[in-house]
Regions:
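Exposed, low-structure sequence patches enriched in small/polar residues
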Residues: 1-30, 38-391
């Protein structure tokens, strides 16, 4: 009589992660766009300095439990240090030094043509936490069809920029220790057929969504030339879903490659609030491509045209002082078509490419932006040569 071992493999390990970031916002002279600033002994320059340090110790156990599947256990000890060095008269703390401990469990099991998996991630301290629970199944059904279904729930504290920020600019100093944790529930589905077709979708419910917004509210007729950015949390839950379809249809030497995405957000906006998570309702990208082999199959070429389009929406813009994107409900961008031409060639170890971007810019109007304050580039031509000396 024989007895199969319940554990086929077992391994212990340790991992150490150290991360260091230094951010320095410098201006020879402060500008009015960010509002008034502190002038120390007549010094009107801006030199805001911040440092972020992460130290993470990870102890893990990986095991294969035979019929029960693969189980991985981890324990993390995390220390953060986020400090500011600024010339400011505001009486606020200059650093955050939190610590956190976490337990993680990952399980995966293969049964026939299906893979099942489960993730559990919990923080032992109540502040600066990040919790997750998720499960999913993926596999094949019928011939050449694949699917993936997942469900997950997240709870996480806002990042450090929302909690503490210091600057020589008077309007950009805050300490918000009582922000609520964000909570996200998500389900997703992905179905594909060979490399020809892929359909995916997801549905999210978000509570306490945390974002930067303009202090003025255009929905109430307010306007602020300084466009001051402040931390904010949504009062009501936000529901967001999207459906994406990708297809690659070969027709002889031609290929039709199409991507279309529909997305929608449902948010009850209270008086004084802004509409957050603003996205274009429709996004589409369509390519017609010709591929061929010439000169006794020694030369490969690809050439074609790509069309891009998205509907209007309130796009976020980048604020360099806080290094974050800011939500605005003042200016919409979008609804401009963009055509790109490309040509690629390869012979042995040499590749050549030419790309003409936004070739329709001169005759389709000039109302095109990549964000509310940054025009999208006009027609541009890029070309290059790649030569590999060794195969």
């Amino acid at each position: 009589q024989t007895c199969a071992l319940p554990i086929l493999s077992l391994s212990l390990g340790y991992q150490y992660i150290h991360e260091y970031k230094k951010l320095n916002f410098k201006q020879d002279r402060g500008v009015s766009f960010f509002g008034d600033f502190f002038s120390v002994e007549g010094n009107k320059s801006i030199d805001d300095l911040s440092r972020f340090i992460l130290n993470e110790n990870i102890f893990y156990l990986k095991s294969n439990l035979n019929n029960l599947g693969d189980v991985n256990l981890s324990f993390k000890l995390i220390k953060w240090k986020n400090t500011y060095q600024v010339q400011s008269d505001v009486d606020l703390i200059n650093s955050l030094n939190p610590q956190q401990s976490k337990i993680l469990i990952n399980w995966k099991k293969k049964l026939s043509n299906f893979n099942f998996y489960f993730d559990f991630d919990t923080s032992l301290n109540n502040s600066y936490k990040s919790n997750k629970i998720g499960l999913g199944i993926e596999g094949n059904f019928l011939n050449n069809f694949k699917f993936n279904i997942t469900g997950s729930k997240f709870e996480r504290s806002p990042n450090f920029n929302f909690i503490l920020f210091r600057s020589k600019y008077e309007n950009y100093n805050w300490y918000n220790p009582n922000l609520k944790d964000e909570k996200i529930s998500k389900v997703s589905l992905d179905i594909s057929f060979k490399d020809y077709l892929n359909l995916s979708g997801e549905y999210n419910i978000i509570d306490n969504f945390t974002f930067f917004r303009e202090s003025a509210n255009p929905l109430l007729g307010e306007f602020d030339v300084l466009r001051k950015a402040i931390p904010n949390q949504s009062i009501n839950e936000i529901k967001y879903y999207k459906i994406k379809l990708y297809s690659n249809i070969p027709i002889g030497k031609f290929s039709l490659i199409n991507t279309a995405q529909y997305q929608k957000k449902d948010q009850a906006v209270e008086t004084g609030e802004l509409s957050a998570i603003n996205v274009p309702e429709w996004i589409t990208r369509n390519t017609v491509m010709y591929s061929s082999k010439l000169f006794n199959r020694s030369l490969d070429i690809q050439t074609g045209v790509t069309f891009n389009y998205f509907t209007k929406f309130w796009a976020n813009y980048y604020n360099p002082l806080i290094s974050e994107f800011v939500v605005q409900n003042y200016k919409e961008i979008g609804e401009f078509p963009r055509f790109d031409f490309f040509f690629n060639a390869k012979i042995q170890q040499t590749r050549v490419f030419i790309k003409v971007e936004h070739l329709n810019s001169s005759f389709s109007g000039y109302d095109y932006y990549s964000d509310p304050f940054t025009p999208y580039r006009d027609l541009s031509v890029r070309f290059g040569l790649v030569w590999n000396f060794f195969q």
